[in-house]
């Protein structure tokens, strides 16, 4: 399955929640009515969605939010099952450790897609070494930075300014002057308020 390249607001409307696929400066919440599905006037059918349908929709939502395709998402789930603790929380923790997501959380990219592009264009280092793999898993204590030649890019400067206004997550510590940050720890499930019901995903893969 290829990565979706169509309108971002359409995906958020389909899932009924903001997937944070666009910059906070142009919030999808202001551009899309989440109580209607894609279509000229939205679909008004009140048909009840099956349990399987709800589980599948939740998985699709999380995949789109983090920009992960099915095969890779399944591998994350299998890895989460092998870890101690709650499988659903482990799954989200692994997704939060992805380098593209950490770059986004630190405010170097205004969206995860933009952060992924920075990684693939070799604009990001981890502990002083260039890393261009978006799925690279960042560990607690790792220092993630923008390379010197990229620090003055307008999109990075603007994204960081916006992130400072909105506020950084507690599990990252960012030095805006150096355009670098430390990934302090894998966030606890209750530390990020994403509109995700990960138990539905666990139920889906346990069928």
From Swiss-Prot:
CDD domains per the UniProt record, alphabetical: S4 (cd00165)
Pfam families according to UniProt: Ribosomal_S4 (PF00163), S4 (PF01479)
Database matches in SUPFAM superfamilies: Alpha-L RNA-binding motif
One Gene Ontology molecular-function label: rRNA binding
Keyword entries, A-Z: Ribonucleoprotein, Ribosomal protein, RNA-binding, rRNA-binding
GO biological process assignments: ribosomal small subunit biogenesis; translation
Domain S4 RNA-binding: 97-157
Chain positions covered by the region annotation Disordered: 31-52
InterPro entries: Ribosomal_uS4, Ribosomal_uS4_bac-type, Ribosomal_uS4_CS, Ribosomal_uS4_N, S4_RNA-bd, S4_RNA-bd_sf
Entries under PROSITE patterns matching the protein: RIBOSOMAL_S4, S4
GO cellular component: small ribosomal subunit
Superkingdom: Bacteria
Assembly description: Part of the 30S ribosomal subunit. Contacts protein S5. The interaction surface between S4 and S5 is involved in control of translational fidelity.
Physiological role: One of the primary rRNA binding proteins, it binds directly to 16S rRNA where it nucleates assembly of the body of the 30S subunit. With S5 and S12 plays an important role in translational accuracy.
Similarity comment text for this entry: Belongs to the universal ribosomal protein uS4 family.
PANTHER family: 30S 40S RIBOSOMAL PROTEIN (PTHR11831), SMALL RIBOSOMAL SUBUNIT PROTEIN US4M (PTHR11831:SF4)
Protein name: Small ribosomal subunit protein uS4
Organism per entry: Acidovorax sp. (strain JS42)
Gene that produces this protein: rpsD
